[in-house]
Amino acid sequence: MNQYAVWGNPIAQSKSPRIHTLFGQQTGKAISYVAKLGDEQQFEQQLKQFFAEGAKGANITAPFKERAFALADLYSESCLQAEACNTLKRLDDGRLYADNTDGVGLVSDLARLGWPKPHQRILILGAGGATKGVLYPLLQAQQQITIYNRTADKAASLAKKFAKFGQIQSACFDELPEQSFDLIINATSLGLQGKCVELPARLLTQANIYDMQYAPNMQTPFLEYARSQGATQYQDGLGMLVGQAAYTFQLWEDVLPDVEPILKQIKQEMEF
């Protein structure tokens, strides 16, 4: 039985063990997948020991994605561009292969929703690790991206770094009301403090709204604010979570699970 785990701190809230257990049942793959609390001082040693004991792979979540990236030997292109990994696979020769499936998870969920269009205008809120993880796949899909971040220099720096891959720019908050977007993605962590970026109502009512965070009945702070401003097309990030997990599972077990029934089951379990 192949051994896997998700590492983070905190980690008790993670849905990943449940998702991967359901993937294993659906595909007939015998796996073990558990949550592991990473130690701020000992994370590298913990991860090395985990693989030394025979584990086949690991998911990495906050705050360890950059540190796990540094431990790998080989990288996918999306992982290299994000400079952070959410997935590690131990190869037969013992080397660690790093991938970042967040971007493909987002792109696949947008496709599931029927939202992607060629050259659509996307506003991404935030310039942290969550944004870095999805920019390369979005630009590969020929999307036009604007990044807004409270620290303008950080957004400008990120836009400059990814400019070689497609159309991307940064914008100050005062510039946003003058623009129009087809899709607005919240990639900030403000929701963890019960806050959100309060965009003008005109932007929220004219675009599809996507929050990378998720909650029962899609009641994240950002989506609740968007609804209060008249937004009618919105979705939380649960589908992205299940989607990225599916591509991780494929990397490990060579079979891509069917996301839809697992997403439906996880959503039902969250709401009851």
Swiss-Prot record:
Highest taxon of the lineage: Bacteria
Signal peptide per UniProt? none
Instruction: Quote the pathway field.
Output: Metabolic intermediate biosynthesis; chorismate biosynthesis; chorismate from D-erythrose 4-phosphate and phosphoenolpyruvate: step 4/7
The entry's shikimate-binding residues are: S14, K15, S16, T61, N86, D102, Y214
Residues bound to NADP(+) are E77, G126, A127, G128, G129, A130, N149, R150, T151, A152, D153, K154, M212, G237
Keyword set, alphabetical order: Amino-acid biosynthesis, Aromatic amino acid biosynthesis, NADP, Oxidoreductase
Does Nucleotide-binding appear among the keywords? no
Cellular component GO terms, alphabetically? cytosol
Pfam families of this UniProt entry? SDH_C, Shikimate_DH, Shikimate_dh_N
Which SUPFAM superfamilies does the UniProt entry name for this protein? Aminoacid dehydrogenase-like, N-terminal domain (SSF53223), NAD(P)-binding Rossmann-fold domains (SSF51735)
Q: Which reaction does it catalyse?
A: shikimate + NADP(+) = 3-dehydroshikimate + NADPH + H(+)
Give the residues annotated as active site.
Answer: K65
**EC number(s) given by UniProt:** 1.1.1.25
Q: What are the recorded Gene Ontology BP terms?
A: amino acid biosynthetic process; aromatic amino acid family biosynthetic process; chorismate biosynthetic process; shikimate metabolic process
Q: What does this protein do?
A: Involved in the biosynthesis of the chorismate, which leads to the biosynthesis of aromatic amino acids. Catalyzes the reversible NADPH linked reduction of 3-dehydroshikimate (DHSA) to yield shikimate (SA).
User: What is annotated about its quaternary structure and interactions?
Assistant: Homodimer.
So what family is this one in? Belongs to the shikimate dehydrogenase family.
Q: What is this protein called?
A: Shikimate dehydrogenase (NADP(+))
* Gene source species: Glaesserella parasuis serovar 5 (strain SH0165)
What broad taxonomic lineage does this protein's source fall under? Bacteria, Pseudomonadati, Pseudomonadota, Gammaproteobacteria, Pasteurellales
